[in-house]
């Protein structure tokens, strides 16, 4: 009937009734209606017994159509004065014309064509009329009847026109909420779904194409309306399936996503908008996820709460959690990439919160999702790169909950540092000592050649020049520069040899100035986001003691609620059973929070006076944790993995201290056979043999590295050890002889780090040794001295010499073919070295025994750990200082695995290294003093079992130098690697402002994602971009050599980036979080 309405209305829009007499229009309207009524009554069975259903002559149907078209035009163009109805509209309402026309359509064959005519007619009325027609029930009721009759249709044309009309109606409702009550009352006859418009839109929520988009837009109008109208909100929550359909629809759409993605090249590490726009199934899912985000943003709190609950319990837990644990690596990698994409696409905090809750708190098969994701960083597949990209996204959120679970919860107790170092957490490095030490790690073999700068900086680049400060005799030392303006006045003379000063007029590294600017921007951006955090995390807030208690209480409260339980809070017992292997003990300990209520509980020692609660029952580590441990051994043999204590030489000394406690509490055991408790667990599994041999290898490596710089002797390792031990033992008790590296540390005589670091700079080198060699070795000495002296101090046992010798003998017998690092093999410690250690310790035994109690009080965290070898059921470590109970020092699995991966920098692929660098610089940009001091303060003295970023960087430096010493064409290969990295960036794709913004975010992220994840900008990161243009082929080298050279090219830039962050923190750390707006540009 109304097939030509749309076309003719466009032609009639040019005709205006302005100036025409309203009475004339009314007369015309009534005449047309009279003609229509004659035809309607003729075919009305109630008034004409001869009328037949559906048999209407075409000419009469066409006549009705023409009359109705003119009538609608007159009604639409009528303009009423004031609030009164116009005469035509009043006539339509009184005569119930719209309902009669609808019944006329029903008498005919109610085909899809008839429905289309009716839908078009109402679309014209509601969109073009000057009067509010929907306020009148005689017009609204037939409209609702028409919509109801179209609800079950499956014709695309009718569905499209129906959604268009519904969209228009919702738009009118949003503008004029007074109509809303009429819709509810009018649709009371429609059953449970008495808000018919809303109910009709629900089936189209997840529809693809224009129809789905228009339906979602219409629903958003109603969602915004619900925020101000609790009646609508209550109806949607109680009487509709909107939230369940939305959440379960996500599950259905996710099941249709590809389980494996196409190969995108070695650069691929995350899904970008350009990628998912090519996948229709992913486009459909992202549209629905974006709609969920929009609904939560504008809807009533009741709807928001119900929706996030359904998404969590209807999509994340039953669908995404199992998908993250698929069998094949490709499926797991794809799911991880999807999760990263979802996080980058969500902007509404309530929706983001449940995704983060899922990652941080949910347990799948008794293993936390966060543990699973962390373990995958240690995989050799592309899954590692995708997992790193996910963590980059998480850290870039600047979310307190994320950082608390990843890092801060392990740093808050402050048991990773020496007790005397607490004051240094908030220390301000005014003289850039940390930056100087970081820059001094630059290998000499990498100091020449080009530097990685962006293309438009290349012409202006000035080669980095080192300052040689002439000292007395042969104490010439290579020092890095501190950027400052060449035109500025000459700086004052250095306060100590360790100061970092640039000479007046020296050339500066342009790229370093860029790093400084980026660091300044990153830190301010992070400070702005952290203003809302609940604590400063500065060692005092939150209070370490109350934090320990709160987590212990929370662990007990949440023990019966797996969903709300915090991750990595598996309760660890100090007394482990004898039949539990060492590998299980180590890995189980690694996933302890370090602050659970039973961490320090066990058989009381002789000095324990305070009663402690009984420990909970032991919990066997899940298979997943055991697999993580095996992967760590297989993939990173010989490298640093903190949580497994692979290189922790103080492990042996802890066992000796434990033996003292065991001998006191269990005198019936024969102390003359100290190896008895360790033989059984050592023989349990072959994996354990690998573990213990690794520990001995790393101990040997540390001893060799420490001994190298001490002199030119035939056997420097053997001769240096007796010289180092007395110095190490005297450090904590004698602060006077060593001068402080700068005025700030001179005013802190009790600071152990000053002694340890100054020992490196003030020690004179032999005259026949090159100055460059001293500069290289000095950093290694600083690294090893920060861990070794405290390890030596922890050796307090009358049986320790015997035990160490027998332990060494056992390991050498069990595993004689231990492999070393990829680039070097580390020999087992010679018995002669241990013999010399024993002799030296015999001489100092009395003094050590006298000082035992004081030393253990100063380092309380060392005593509270269970033995890594396994002990008797009734034997455990007990605190020597019960007033301050501490757990085994541990910085958390995430930090541990990231540092272990970084230490293998030379073996990693380029993309792994770039992501690792990005994550570490993200972490180093946080203003929280605990995190800042742990990563960037090179003078901090940590517990012997805790390895710092500075020590890992020193290890990487040594590996690079060792490789350079055996690679004849190292300088040429280095230049090739640097050029290859430079040409990876296509500067034509970058905006000029990209140098002051995050290159990864600006290049890689779609426009819709940039509002949420504004991660810290990094100069190095353009080399990682998916659009990086490789204009030159990489050097044609074997893969291990290629990876090593690319890592050697990145390493100096990484050091400059960290040094710049350290310097900028020294400027900005005095600012209160929130008092920095004036510094933002």
UniProtKB/Swiss-Prot annotation:
Probable component of the FTS/Hook/FHIP complex (FHF complex). FHF complex promotes the distribution of AP-4 complex to the perinuclear area of the cell. Residues 567-576, 727-738, 746-762 have a biased composition (Polar residues). Residues 553-564 have a biased composition (Basic and acidic residues). It holds the Pfam family RAI16-like. May be a component of the FTS/Hook/FHIP complex (FHF complex), composed of AKTIP/FTS, FHIP1B, and one or more members of the Hook family of proteins HOOK1, HOOK2, and HOOK3. May interact directly with AKTIP/FTS. Residues 474-496, 544-623, 658-770, 863-883 are annotated as: Disordered. Belongs to the FHIP family. GO terms for biological process: protein localization to perinuclear region of cytoplasm. InterPro entries: FHIP (IPR019384), FHIP_C (IPR045669), FHIP_KELAA_motif (IPR045668). This is FHF complex subunit HOOK-interacting protein 1A. Transmembrane segments: none annotated. Residues 680-707 have a biased composition (Acidic residues). Residues 486-496 have a biased composition (Pro residues).
